[in-house]
């Protein structure tokens, strides 16, 4: 193993699309780790979906041997991280395993919201940060402006920033030299009791759970008996290895090393991310500080379109949960949709990706209900409940107070679009908290908003109102009491639980009317009348009807008495009544999305 003073552990942090994964590819090229034959874009993004969308979802760790200009052999452990706000927990786990970070900033775009959010995460871990300006080969790059933004907005010295083009490979060797010269070597005592931090884990069908970890103190060897400090479970290490970039076995790790271990661990819950691995014979006195447990904040119901696929959906969800600590699910039933699962996600991108993976990797047709956030209810008895499904809201007479989650959001926007952003945030019940200038024409606006207002289309609207120039980052701060009501949708007098939603009373009438109108358009006409109603409690606030399709029963009557025609029409009317009583309305998937798209009306 390499000497501790010659190890450098670092991660690459950046806003989404600023070129992290491309820079990681070039570093692998320059160090000769990836052969010409194996080359592909986004080498570290293993998931097909990651490469297709051009985003990083799971953090990846790779060991890079590097011979520096001073002639010494170094080991660089690169931990690639995602940039999207939904996956910021993946970033914080990766940073806990490093001593330093490369901050990649797009020289054409400048400092953006998630750049700042990730920098503050890195500073929380006392990291040394090296600014890297990417895309300097583009004619639209403005190096001087971006350096000024880094100095004013973040407070880093940009004079030392490395200017690169990850696409062409220009100056990537300078980045490697900067890592060796400016980032500190890991500290830690190899003779102390073992303390190793788990920063990622996933399930392998042959080896059980594979644990990615960073040794802080002590030494770990193949065959050692280890213990997880959070769960107390004991295992024997069957395999130790590193990704370089493909898996290679090693015999032992000492303080400062990053690698993976297999120990026939059956369940992902037994090797939790943030837990500490120690020896069972000589355990460490205290565990390492881990990460706070991530809680899903957006919930939606997932139902198989074919009810016979219910067990298959359960298997698929369990399989996805093995590799995704932040995803949760539990069984639920709906009168309208049958048996399905209530799933919890970190945000909307996370939800989209899970849905897409279920449909693509497991070939299951899904119906998804409208996403909702977690509300807090204070009952008359003084009991606190958290409500993930609007249909589970208690009777209004039993509710003392209804609380919704609020987020603090930072929006970075060019000067000319500030008015549009204010207007959007006011519409979404936002409270302005702060506004400051990052540069002459770039503003950071801070708002506090109800999470429910931003969960569906806020980001899309923000992008279109600012021509794609705005970027945002948010964190959940607290629960606040609001004037909220449950809006029920009724089809022919029967409430459809999957369409129920919790809305602010001021918006309930408009929202109810808009959903009813949209449902009227999406539900196909039947042989009987279909009435769509929106209700708050027992009060109907909106009503739409789809007229029945009717056969011209009097077509065969040529002339003759009017009573003959009337008799046929009365007979048809009776039949329609019976049909309406007996008939079921088939709701298409679009009907469930109707509840989401009401703001466009």
From Swiss-Prot:
This is Elongation factor 4. InterPro entries: EF-4 (IPR006297), EFG_III/V (IPR035647), EFG_V-like (IPR000640), EFTu-like_2 (IPR004161), G_TR_CS (IPR031157), LepA_C_sf (IPR038363), LepA_CTD (IPR013842), LepA_IV (IPR035654). Keywords: Cell inner membrane, Cell membrane, GTP-binding, Hydrolase, Membrane, Nucleotide-binding, Protein biosynthesis. It catalyses: GTP + H2O = GDP + phosphate + H(+). It is a peripheral membrane protein. The gene is lepA. PANTHER family: TRANSLATION FACTOR GUF1 HOMOLOG, CHLOROPLASTIC, TRANSLATION FACTOR GUF1-RELATED. GO terms for biological process: positive regulation of translation. Pfam families: EFG_C, GTP_EFTU, GTP_EFTU_D2, LepA_C. SMART domains: EFG_C. The keyword Lyase does not apply.
């Amino acid at each position: 193993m390499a000497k501790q003073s010659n190890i450098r552990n670092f991660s690459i942090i950046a806003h989404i699309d600023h070129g992290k994964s491309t820079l990681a590819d070039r570093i692998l090229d320059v160090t000769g780790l990836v052969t010409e034959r194996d080359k592909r874009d986004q080498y570290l993004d293993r998931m097909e979906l990651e490469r297709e969308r051009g985003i990083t979802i799971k953090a990846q760790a790779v060991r890079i041997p590097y011979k520096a200009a001073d002639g010494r052999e170094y080991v660089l452990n690169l931990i690639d991280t995602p940039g999207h706000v939904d996956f910021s927990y993946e970033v914080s786990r990766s940073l806990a395993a490093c001593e330093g970070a490369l901050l990649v900033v797009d020289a054409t775009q400048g400092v953006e919201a998630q750049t700042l959010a990730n920098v503050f995460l890195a500073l929380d871990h006392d990291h040394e940060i090296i600014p890297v300006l990417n895309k300097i080969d583009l004619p639209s790059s403005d190096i001087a402006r971006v350096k000024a933004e880094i100095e004013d907005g973040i407070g880093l010295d940009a004079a030392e920033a490395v200017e690169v083009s990850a696409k062409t490979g220009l100056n990537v060797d300078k980045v490697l030299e900067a890592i060796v010269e400016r980032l500190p070597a890991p500290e830690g005592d190899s003779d102390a009791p073992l303390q190793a931090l788990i920063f990622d884990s996933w399930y392998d069908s042959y080896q059980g759970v594979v644990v990615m970890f960073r040794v802080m103190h002590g030494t770990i060897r193949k065959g050692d008996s280890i213990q997880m400090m959070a769960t107390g479970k004991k295992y024997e290490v069957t395999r130790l290895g590193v990704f370089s970039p493909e898996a290679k076995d090693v015999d032992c790790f000492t303080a400062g090393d990053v690698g993976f271990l297999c120990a026939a661990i059956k369940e992902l819950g037994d090797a939790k991310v943030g837990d500490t691995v120690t020896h069972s014979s000589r355990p460490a006195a205290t565990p390492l500080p881990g990460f706070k447990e991530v809680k899903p904040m957006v919930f939606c119901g997932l139902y198989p379109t074919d009810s016979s696929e219910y067990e298959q959906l359960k298997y698929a969800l369990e399989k996805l949960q093995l590799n995704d600590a932040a995803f949760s699910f539990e069984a639920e039933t709906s009168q309208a949709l049958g048996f399905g699962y209530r799933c919890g996600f970190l945000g909307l991108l996370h939800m989209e990706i899970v849905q897409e993976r279920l449909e693509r990797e497991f070939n299951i047709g899904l119906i998804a209900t409208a996403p909702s956030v977690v509300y807090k209810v204070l009952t008359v008895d003084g009991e606190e409940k958290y409500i993930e499904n609007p249909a589970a809201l208690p009777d209004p007479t039993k509710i003392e107070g209804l609380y919704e989650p609020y987020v603090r959001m930072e929006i970075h926007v060019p000067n000319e679009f500030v008015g549009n952003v204010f207007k959007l945030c006011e519409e979404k019940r936002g409270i302005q908290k702060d506004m400051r200038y990052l540069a002459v024409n770039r503003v950071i606006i801070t708002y506090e908003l109800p999470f429910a207002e931003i969960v569906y289309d806020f980001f899309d609207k923000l992008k279109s109102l600012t021509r794609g120039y705005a970027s945002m980052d948010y964190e959940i701060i607290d629960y606040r009491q609001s004037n909220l009501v449950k809006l029920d949708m009724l089809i022919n007098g029967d409430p459809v639980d999957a369409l129920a939603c919790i809305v602010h009373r001021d918006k309930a009438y408009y929202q109810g009317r808009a959903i009813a109108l949209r449902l009227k358009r999406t539900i196909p006409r039947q042989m009987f009348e279909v009435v769509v109603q929106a209700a708050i409690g027992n009060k109907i606030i909106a009503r739409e009807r789809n007229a029945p399709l009717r056969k011209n029963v009097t077509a065969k009557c040529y002339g003759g008495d009017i009573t003959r025609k009337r008799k046929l029409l009365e007979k048809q009317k009776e039949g329609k009544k019976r049909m309406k009583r007996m008939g079921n309305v088939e709701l298409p998937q679009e009907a469930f999305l109707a509840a989401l798209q009401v703001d466009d009306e």
